[in-house]
Each structure stands twice: as C-alpha cells, then as structure tokens.
Amino acid sequence: MNKDHTLYCSVYIRNAFFSEIGIGISANSCLLLFHTFMFIRGHRPRLTDLPIGFVALIHLVMLLLAAYITEDFFMSSGGWDDITCKLVIFLHRFFRSLSVCATCLLSVFQAIILCPQSSHLAKLKQNSPHQLSYFFIFLSIFYTSISSQILIAAIPTQNITFVNLIYITNSCSFLPLSSSMQHTFSTLLTFRNVFVIGLMGLSTCYMATLLCRHKTRSQRLQNSKLSPKATPEQRALRTILMLMSFFLLMSTFDSIISYSRTIITGKSTALLCPDSCRS
C-alpha cells in the first residue's frame, strides 16, 4: 500500500513538473516567435522588443534544461557522465541567474523609458541599452563565479560510495561542501537576490508613481471627474503591479527556501533538487 501510494505521488509530482515546464516553454516560444516574426516583417521595433525577446530566449533555454533534468530525476536509471552532469547543472543554474538578472534589467529599462524629460534619468534614454548591456555582462560574470563551485561539487552518481551526497537527479549528485564554503556561497547568493529584487522593486514603484502622476495631470487638464471606467493608466498600473508583485513574491520565497536549505547540513535528500538546480 505504501509502495503504491509513493508511486502515485511520484507520478503526480512528475506530471505537475512537466505540465509547468510545458506551459513555460510554449509561452516563451510564442513570445519569441512573435517578436522574430515582427522583426522579419520589417516592423519598426520598440525599445523594449529586443530585451523582451532576449528574456524569452533565456527562459526558453532554462526550461529546456529543466525538462532534461526533470526527465533524469523521474525516469532515467542514471546515465550521465561527469562532463554531462557538471555541464547540465551548471548551465541550468547559470541561465536561471540570467533570467532573474534580465527580468530585473527589463524592469529598469521600462522605468527609464517612462521617465519624463525633466527627470535625471532622461539623460540615460539614448545610452541605456548600451549601459544596461555592460551591466548585464558584469552580472553574468559575477553569476558565473558564484556558480563555478558546481564544476567541483557536481559528480555522477554511479559507482560513488560517499554517504553524505546531495542527490540532484538519478545521474548526478553534489559533494558535501565545508561549512565555510556553504556560508560563503549562501552570502553571495543572498546578496545577489537582495540586490536584484530590490532594484526591481524600486523600478516598479517608480513606474507606478509616474503612471499615477500622469493620470492626475490628465484629469486636471480635462477637468473631468473620476470615471467608473478604468483608464489606460490604471490598467497599465494594475498589470505592472500584479506581474511584478507576483515575480517579487516568488523570487523572495525561492531565495528564502534556497538559503534555508543551503545552511542546513547533513540532510541529503532528493527534495533538494529544485533549490539546488535553480539557485
């Protein structure tokens, strides 16, 4: 009975993982194809089209890697060699970091575009794509240095006799790190998450403030009373706040869980896979 219940739970969790990944791959593929099609048709691109397409591409690669890892976690009998194990886990963590970084920079870029000409940020409008590109490259190098420990810690599971391995998939595991190394990487990851999430939150608040000011000025110029129908500014504000609030909430929750799992030693369990693969 317990075996049947465990098998049922495993199948249920596997289907949930693949459904989530499938929805993400479909959505990002459609978004990327849409922007590619618009570019091929010769439509004049907006300033945000290239960053949005780039974010969709990063998410697509990350989700494809996640599908490969999930397949090995639930279905494979363990067939990765040392190079495949290190490369797949490293690339997945790297692209997940780029996903958070690119989404944050997209939020900053949108805030710069919306800023009025009288703002100090208006000077950055023309050069912002280049400056944000340099900043993105810097963060990519920083994330690579943080994730480099995977190239040492990740090993294939076959023919390994270590007791305290942290199992990632059926084919790949993590060697236990020393307490000082764990706290070092946890501190770096926490600093990264606090910085990126904080910057995204500030950008969201700035955009919300600009939209509220624009709505107030429009009503004053038109001498109109509040209409029960939502204005374009209100709809844009609700959309921005809803999306960013959800992203910030999930990122914060994921960071807390990842940090908590990292500082707890001696608990080698397969449930560490989502946080170990995505941190």
From Swiss-Prot:
It holds the Pfam family V1R. InterPro entries: GPCR_Rhodpsn_7TM, Vmron_rcpt_1. Residues 41-49, 115-134, 181-187, 260-279 are cytoplasmic. The chain crosses the membrane at residues 20-40, 50-70, 94-114, 135-155, 160-180, 188-208, 239-259. Disruption phenotype: Mice lacking all but one V1ra and V1rb gene (12% of the V1r repertoire) show a lack of chemosensory response to a subset of known pheromonal ligands and changes in maternal aggression as well as male reproductive behavior. GO terms for molecular function: pheromone receptor activity. Disulfide bonds join 85-172. Belongs to the G-protein coupled receptor 1 family. This is Vomeronasal type-1 receptor A8. It comes from Mus musculus. The gene is V1ra8.
